[in-house]
């Protein structure tokens, strides 16, 4: 019998909603990256986009361990000389909590061509409301670990 290789049309995609309230940022990012890649599916293949859609709500209430809010810096560059901007993680979470989660989840994904297609299935919201109720997303629970 020959080995079965899944095609992108053979994959049925589910919708998951994750509540980020008091969940550690790195743990949330690894679970979301695994869902986006489809690592838990029996049809997983690393060369096929077989991941699911992930909705993350309450991104502004994500937990950051130790003193990383004040210590860790975020950098971006405008492309012009002297255009390096820096901001602490805490300030970045105040201004753009969605962007912080998107960057951390993208960093947990493999750096190849499939990542761009997988990240398009990530939907992050700072509040508890999202416009994807018609897709009937399942809740995905992340176990809390004692800190």
Curated annotation (Swiss-Prot):
Record InterPro entries: Ribosomal_uL13, Ribosomal_uL13_bac-type, Ribosomal_uL13_sf
CDD domains: Ribosomal_L13 (cd00392)
Keyword tags: Ribonucleoprotein, Ribosomal protein
GO cellular component, one term: cytosolic large ribosomal subunit
Gene Ontology biological process terms from the UniProt entry: negative regulation of translation; translation
UniProt-recorded Gene Ontology molecular function terms: mRNA binding; structural constituent of ribosome
A Pfam family assignment: Ribosomal_L13
Superkingdom per UniProt: Bacteria
Family statement drawn from the similarity comment of this UniProt entry: Belongs to the universal ribosomal protein uL13 family.
Purpose of the protein: This protein is one of the early assembly proteins of the 50S ribosomal subunit, although it is not seen to bind rRNA by itself. It is important during the early stages of 50S assembly.
Subunit description: Part of the 50S ribosomal subunit.
Full protein name: Large ribosomal subunit protein uL13
Organism, as annotated: Corynebacterium efficiens (strain DSM 44549 / YS-314 / AJ 12310 / JCM 11189 / NBRC 100395)
């Amino acid at each position: 019998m020959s080995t079965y290789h899944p095609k992108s049309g053979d994959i049925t995609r589910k919708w998951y909603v994750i509540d980020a309230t008091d969940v550690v940022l790195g743990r949330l990012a690894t679970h979301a990256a695994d869902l986006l890649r489809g690592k838990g599916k029996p049809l997983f293949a690393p060369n096929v986009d077989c991941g699911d859609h992930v909705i993350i709500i309450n991104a502004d209430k994500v937990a950051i361990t130790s003193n990383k809010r004040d210590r860790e810096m975020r950098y971006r560059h405008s492309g012009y000389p002297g255009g390096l901007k820096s901001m602490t993680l805490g300030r970045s979470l105040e201004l753009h909590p969605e962007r912080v989660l998107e960057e951390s989840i993208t960093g947990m994904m493999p750096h190849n061509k499939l990542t761009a297609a997988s990240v398009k299935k990530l939907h992050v919201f700072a509040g508890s409301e999202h416009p994807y109720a018609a897709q009937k997303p399942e809740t995905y629970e992340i176990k809390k670990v004692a800190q």
